[in-house]
Amino acid sequence: AVGASEGINVLVEKTNQVTKERWYGVSNVEYTELDKLGISDEPAENSGAEESAYPANTNVLYVGLKHIRDTLTSSPRAAFPGMLINLSKAVKKDGTKGGRLECSMQNIADALMRKSPGKLTKKDWMNLPTFVLFTLRRRVTSSAKRQRKPGDKSLAQTPDGSFLDLLLNASDMLSKCSIEHPPPDDGSAERYLNTGPGFIFAIHPAMGPLWDIIAQKIRGGSLARKSEVKLEIAELNWENVRVDGSLLITCTNVTGEGTMSDIDCGRARIVDVDVLNAGIDWENEGNVYWSAMYSRDESAEIVLHGNAEIDIEGCALRGNCAYEVPNGKRLVIRSVNGDAGCLSETYEDIVPGVPSWRWKYAFGGKDDIQSDLVKLHL
């Protein structure tokens, strides 16, 4: 947005006045330096007065390590890129500005510019060693720089706004997973602020982190309005799970014990299951959803210790229920005589180092990652 307190991305051209050599690269200019460099943060064409003509600066996402090492050995300035004094904040009541020495790592791009004996054309700009990756801002960052005051309906740069961005991303991912769900804001920003989000969905990043991977582990189902799903697990096989209430899955060893391992970690297989309970107490005025501080009336909770497993298929988990599976055990839950609400629970020993199943990953034909479920011991 125009006037936002953040940097922008620009194409930089530097000229050696002696040799007339030029250097080109895409880099970052912090918002505190715009006036100094004669840059006016103006709105983009046909965008009204809100959207800036410049792409917003975020972070360095991809970097060639070899080039960075070579740059650091050739110039000590590269070790402290983008040095500046930020005098934008008043530190005393009389308005006295306080100085903050900053080092913006985005400006490491300044050390990776392309040398040219003459002026480059616009066509050449596409072949620079630095580039900008465009995506939705909320995919990369959502800053919470101020506390929302009572009655304030603006979500920009507040914890409430950042949490909504998180849920908007979750909504996009759930659609990729073919899971029906309500709108994250429950229909409007006003309803979101007054009664909470339309749903809450959170997963451990180790489940992917790529959405393409997550969409192969979570396939089909639905989240009813005001439902909650929290999946602190990496090894999950979810298929056609319908949640109306709260479903909480927690592993003590999400990625193994001590070291990264997809063997010595908890895993859950949940297929054709209905979760039905009262879930979150949405009427509780003390709920603070963005900080995960809220009360529940009921929930279906699963805790997996160590390499424990749970296997649920063709069942309905109704009301307040909890399953805690110890290390080295597998809990199998099935319906009895076709009655989804009448359940049988069977504990089995896990062969050390041999889980029931695991995901096998391989690159596909389009450099995508394909994951196949491999049954090891059933």
Which functions belong to the PLM regions below?
Residues 2-378:
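Left-handed beta-helix
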